[in-house]
Amino acid sequence: MTSTKDKTAITPTRENDYPEWYQQVVKASDLAENSPVRGSMVIKPWGYGIWENIQRQLDDRIKETGHENAYFPLFIPLSFLEKEAAHIEGFAKECAVVTHHRLEEKDGRLIPAGPLEEPLIVRPTSETIIGDSFSRWVESYRDLPLLINQWANVVRWEMRPRIFLRTTEFLWQEGHTAHATHEEALQETMTMLEVYRSFVEDVLAIPVIVGEKSPGERFPGAENTFTLEAMMQDRKALQSCTSHYLGQNFAKGSNIRFSNMEGQLEYAYTTSWGMTTRLIGSLIMCHGDDDGLRLPPRIAHKQIVIVPVIPKPELEAQVLEYAENLAAELRKQIFYGKPLTVHIDKRDKRGGEKNWEWVKKGVPLRLEVGPRDINEQAVMVARRDQSPKNKQSLPKQQFVQQAASILEDIQRNYYVQAATYRDQHIYRHLETFEEMRAFFTPKNEEKPEIHGGFVLAKWCGDPVTEEMLSDLKVTIRCLPVKQSGTKGRCILTGREATLDAIFAKSY
């Protein structure tokens, strides 16, 4: 983190008040705002442009693995959820329930009327409603695998909302698949986990730990839940996505059966996996600095912004023509298979004001062009991965040819910076529960947000022991897929243990 002595665009800084810094970055970068409905947000064009890029690029990867998109109802009959007692237990307190189907006016006010015969649940997740369709679509092993994805909104009533991180309504994609064998379904679970990992690390430049959830953190009704865990700059964990192997549990509840190769009826093996708008919050907290958002070029929907510098009205046409020609040349350059996205800021504002707006919005490259640049056939270049004061004049043609490689360098820098920060704050030397308690106890009760980081330690695997962590507000984030295989002592009980586990506070 930068020194608080430096003048910054965002107040307070991360060090001074991390939660408020986050809220101010959301506001200053014009990503989103709160709505009249508590816990729901308005995603503004700058924020939604990021989500559209996430959608486009992730959707391509999902389809490359053989999945197709479909859409299922927002409303789920209560009876569908009652079939899955273990599943709904995890969502019951968060469900929004529709009980009436119309409004009537009474004494000048509108009141609900027309009670429904059966209450409807506003989609918290879609396993049950999609399972109902799967039960009709699957008859034979020849109908499998069934590989479906849905882009939709979800409602989970949130008592402590925070924009992008925890909202009552959020956007996501949810994949649902059915398979003939346990092996195929488990392979699907891991395949999609790898799709997520490569997307989050390669496109969003967020380093993650790939692992399996402990029983206490597992998706309700799943046999296995796999996750990607990222470290934010307050050293808390943020779950970036999950991929669930559901076994035959949901197939039995939804009666998804097929005739196998021997002609016998068998329940299908299913999976589900999802990623949400929470990723935008992860981008902010992983890459943002005390001047605002910093967008990795591969996810930025405006990779380059040109700010014309017009000292006199009579020079406006000449400067704008130079800017238009520069933009046209840049758009011919290819970055990861697509033309560079370039925007010319023609608003009637002072150059300095416009520059700082784009700094706060996180645009990877800012360019200034004015009369001097025209005379020298040059361009003034500022990179978002460097100090806003750092500007370099480059020959125009040289910059055009180097633009894509500069963006690639910025992309790489963001990943390396985040990975270095994470690795510096994973602690491997703690051995006892008392040491863990001391590690996670805030040194300053008035500012408890920024604590030590992640603890990598041995765990005995006993689900009961997870309850010991509740008063510390710590959870087992995951059991890393890459296990050391060494023996040691469980940090919670002192018993012999072989499992490596990541312990952390989280969002």
Curated annotation (Swiss-Prot):
Top-level EC class: ligase
GO terms for biological process, alphabetical: prolyl-tRNA aminoacylation
GO cellular component, one term: cytoplasm
Keyword Nucleotide-binding: yes
Gene3D superfamilies: Anticodon-binding domain (3.40.50.800), Bira Bifunctional Protein, Domain 2 (3.30.930.10), C-terminal domain of ProRS (3.30.110.30)
Location within or outside the cell: Cytoplasm
Pfam families recorded: HGTP_anticodon (PF03129), ProRS-C_1 (PF09180), tRNA-synt_2b (PF00587)
Domain description: Consists of three domains: the N-terminal catalytic domain, the anticodon-binding domain and the C-terminal extension.
Protein name: Proline--tRNA ligase
Complexes and interactors: Homodimer.
Keyword Ligase: yes
Domain of life from the UniProt record: Bacteria
Biological function: Catalyzes the attachment of proline to tRNA(Pro) in a two-step reaction: proline is first activated by ATP to form Pro-AMP and then transferred to the acceptor end of tRNA(Pro).
Enzyme Commission number, as recorded: 6.1.1.15
PANTHER family: BIFUNCTIONAL GLUTAMATE_PROLINE--TRNA LIGASE (PTHR43382:SF2), PROLYL-TRNA SYNTHETASE (PTHR43382)
Alphabetical UniProt keywords: Aminoacyl-tRNA synthetase, ATP-binding, Cytoplasm, Ligase, Nucleotide-binding, Protein biosynthesis
GO MF annotation, one: proline-tRNA ligase activity
Family of this protein: Belongs to the class-II aminoacyl-tRNA synthetase family. ProS type 3 subfamily.
Catalytic reaction annotation: tRNA(Pro) + L-proline + ATP = L-prolyl-tRNA(Pro) + AMP + diphosphate
